[in-house]
């Protein structure tokens, strides 16, 4: 029976060891394992959230880039249209200025031509009167002179 008492003593010692381990050793180990599992799970969730945030940020950046390109294209088109409009306006203004200058020059030429004609008429009338005076050897009075000049001027 010695063996039974030894076996009983070992069983009691083993039971006390198991109880001691369950009471004092097992809870901190289980707590450490659970803390580690929670930490790993939180890390995985954070990584998943970060990946989703990254995907969202990349999508937003892509959308913003597309929007910026579209806006830039619109601005370039507007600038080109404005450039063409400014060029057309400048051409129209230049054409109007050219026409104005030509009209003014033609008017000046016409005025100068009329002045030259009047001057020439006066000279021709004066020469005609001088010639007529020499032919007639007499002087024409002022009223007759004026009538003759007006008549000759009108005919010329």
UniProtKB/Swiss-Prot annotation:
The record's keywords, sorted A to Z, are: ATP synthesis, Cell inner membrane, Cell membrane, CF(0), Hydrogen ion transport, Ion transport, Membrane, Transmembrane, Transmembrane helix, Transport
Give one GO term, molecular function aspect. Answer: proton-transporting ATPase activity, rotational mechanism
SUPFAM superfamilies reported for this sequence = F1F0 ATP synthase subunit B, membrane domain (SSF81573)
Which cell locations does it reside in? Cell inner membrane
Q: Which InterPro entries match?
A: ATP_synth_B-like_membr_sf, ATP_synth_b/b'su_bac/chlpt, ATP_synth_F0_bsu_bac, ATP_synthase_B_chain
Q: What is its main location?
A: membrane
Q: How does it sit in the membrane?
A: Single-pass membrane protein
Q: Where are the transmembrane segments?
A: 7-29
Cellular component terms per the entry's GO annotation: plasma membrane; proton-transporting ATP synthase complex
The record's CDD domains line, in alphabetical order, gives: ATP-synt_Fo_b
The annotated subunit structure for this chain is: F-type ATPases have 2 components, F(1) - the catalytic core - and F(0) - the membrane proton channel. F(1) has five subunits: alpha(3), beta(3), gamma(1), delta(1), epsilon(1). F(0) has three main subunits: a(1), b(2) and c(10-14). The alpha and beta chains form an alternating ring which encloses part of the gamma chain. F(1) is attached to F(0) by a central stalk formed by the gamma and epsilon chains, while a peripheral stalk is formed by the delta and b chains.
> What family is this?
Belongs to the ATPase B chain family.
Q: What does this protein do?
A: F(1)F(0) ATP synthase produces ATP from ADP in the presence of a proton or sodium gradient. F-type ATPases consist of two structural domains, F(1) containing the extramembraneous catalytic core and F(0) containing the membrane proton channel, linked together by a central stalk and a peripheral stalk. During catalysis, ATP synthesis in the catalytic domain of F(1) is coupled via a rotary mechanism of the central stalk subunits to proton translocation.
Could you identify this protein by its name? ATP synthase subunit b
The major lineage groups are: Bacteria, Pseudomonadati, Pseudomonadota, Gammaproteobacteria, Vibrionales
């Amino acid at each position: 029976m010695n063996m039974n008492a030894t076996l009983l003593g070992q069983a009691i010692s083993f039971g006390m060891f198991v109880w001691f381990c369950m009471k004092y050793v097992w809870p901190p180990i289980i707590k450490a394992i659970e803390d580690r599992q929670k930490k790993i799970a939180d890390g995985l969730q954070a990584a998943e959230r970060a990946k989703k945030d990254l995907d969202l940020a990349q999508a937003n950046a892509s959308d913003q880039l597309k929007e910026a390109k579209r806006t830039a294209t619109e601005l370039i088109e507007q600038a080109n249209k404005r450039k063409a409009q400014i060029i057309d306006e400048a051409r129209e203004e230049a054409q109007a200025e050219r026409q104005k200058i030509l009209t003014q020059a033609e008017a000046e030429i016409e005025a100068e031509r009329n002045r030259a004609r009047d001057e020439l008429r006066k000279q021709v009338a004066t020469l005609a009167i001088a010639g007529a005076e020499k032919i007639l050897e007499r002087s024409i009075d002022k009223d007759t002179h004026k009538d003759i000049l007006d008549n000759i001027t009108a005919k010329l």
